[in-house]
Amino acid sequence: MGLPWYRVHTVVLNDPGRLLAVHIMHTALVAGWAGSMALYELAVFDPSDPVLDPMWRQGMFVIPFMTRLGITSSWGGWSITGGATPNPGIWSYEGVAGAHIVFSGLCFLAAIWHWTYWDLAIFCDERTGKPSLDLPKIFGIHLFLAGLACFGFGAFHVTGLYGPGIWVSDPYGLTGKVQSVNPAWGVEGFDPFVPGGIASHHIAAGTLGILAGLFHLSVRPPQRLYKGLRMGNIETVLSSSIAAVFFAAFVVAGTMWYGSATTPIELFGPTRYQWDQGYFQQEIYRRVSAGLAENQSLSEAWSKIPEKLAFYDYIGNNPAKGGLFRAGSMDNGDGIAVGWLGHPIFRDKEGRELFVRRMPTFFETFPVVLVDGDGIVRADVPFRRAESKYSVEQVGVTVEFYGGELNGVSYSDPATVKKYARRAQLGEIFELDRATLKSDGVFRSSPRGWFTFGHASFALLFFFGHIWHGARTLFRDVFAGIDPDLDAQVEFGAFQKLGDPTTRRQTV
């Protein structure tokens, strides 16, 4: 045929049997990738420290998606929440991976069968005997089945009526676990951080899909609408399908990047906005203040801060800190977190408490500036020593740690104080192991960042694909050069330009 690479899919344009075959093969490839990727991740995943080395720090991509749907245990005897687990049965991480691979193999065989036996009676129009698909009817069938699956997921899986429920956590990502969720039918169901909205929206959307599917199965489209939207053309199906996919991709890119109940921070890591807004820092200070109000000492109050909460308040877990093209997990960047050193409190020689100004997200370097409670600069690490007025040495800054491994330890040596002031720019201070993975010290993004970038990029690409194929199907007659109002019988091949009698070919 000699088709250029960008036109090879025309071979299935008027061949319903093989069009079905290539779609089944595509499903086989997707399911096969998912199962294989899950097995690879399980082979390299270390479940030993869910607090300081969670899945998102290790660069896991498919494990978080399995976990949010209710899978928490492995046939290897470990649980995602830590500790040993009894036999989880078929629906373990390995079981899900295996199910995808088996499904992929069955789809592979089905694709070969449909490629071989392409000329089936079901694809032929009874009146003409030629290949033909009733596309509005097929649309109704697919809408009905998709609605059924959507309703079933919301009504049974999410609610725990017949299924495990989904991953639910508190606003600070500390107490997450898989549990059943009751549908939220009030206005709170529209809050993207309320899990009940997932159940209610799937039930509502599924019901709508079922009803819409039945409508399209029982009601034929008007002739003008059928012709106007080119409902008889398979490229119309391609165009509208691409529209559905790119719209969904834009939506999930948003819910992933800005955060929602569907993207828990325990599974995908915190969002950049939680660093920008000091979200975890405020909660930590609130807990410390509450402890002091209960007559606890500063050391006791800080010691009660969960290590998990302190770890979220560290810039290395900000997905916007990693470059888009820096390959590898977060652990390959700043290293594997080993322990929280504690919260450093800086004071000048007059006893004023000083706060290190934190590094904004999009800075690689940032001046070390210490301010008092009123925001007045009291100390810094100067760029030019000759002009310094606020240097650590001149101001006499000391640091004392509360909570963590260095609880109660204080330093007055200027070099040590400056070292911890620099590290305090990055949030809470952690000991990081860079030797094990030969980590290079350059921040990496989390799976939250990769997912967002990938889906936003492909959504943009698919948007242009929708415009392209939509234009092709709507203006097919224009592109082909055939006048849609041409009444004369047209003989293909008789004219150089189809339907133009002034370009009749000359016989040799």
UniProtKB/Swiss-Prot annotation:
One of its GO terms (molecular function) is electron transporter, transferring electrons within the cyclic electron transport pathway of photosynthesis activity. Keywords: Chlorophyll, Chloroplast, Chromophore, Membrane, Photosynthesis, Photosystem II, Plastid, Thylakoid, Transmembrane, Transmembrane helix. Signal peptide: none annotated. It is found in: Plastid, Chloroplast thylakoid membrane. GO terms for cellular component: chloroplast thylakoid membrane; photosystem II. Its main location: plastid. InterPro entries: PS_antenna-like (IPR000932), PS_II_antenna-like_sf (IPR036001), PSII_PsbB (IPR017486). The chain crosses the membrane at residues 21-36, 101-115, 140-156, 203-218, 237-252, 457-472. Binds multiple chlorophylls. PSII binds additional chlorophylls, carotenoids and specific lipids. GO terms for biological process: photosynthetic electron transport in photosystem II. It is a multi-pass membrane protein. Pfam families: PSII. HAMAP family: PSII_PsbB_CP47. PSII is composed of 1 copy each of membrane proteins PsbA, PsbB, PsbC, PsbD, PsbE, PsbF, PsbH, PsbI, PsbJ, PsbK, PsbL, PsbM, PsbT, PsbX, PsbY, PsbZ, Psb30/Ycf12, at least 3 peripheral proteins of the oxygen-evolving complex and a large number of cofactors. It forms dimeric complexes. Belongs to the PsbB/PsbC family. PsbB subfamily. One of the components of the core complex of photosystem II (PSII). It binds chlorophyll and helps catalyze the primary light-induced photochemical processes of PSII. PSII is a light-driven water:plastoquinone oxidoreductase, using light energy to abstract electrons from H(2)O, generating O(2) and a proton gradient subsequently used for ATP formation. This is Photosystem II CP47 reaction center protein. The gene is psbB.
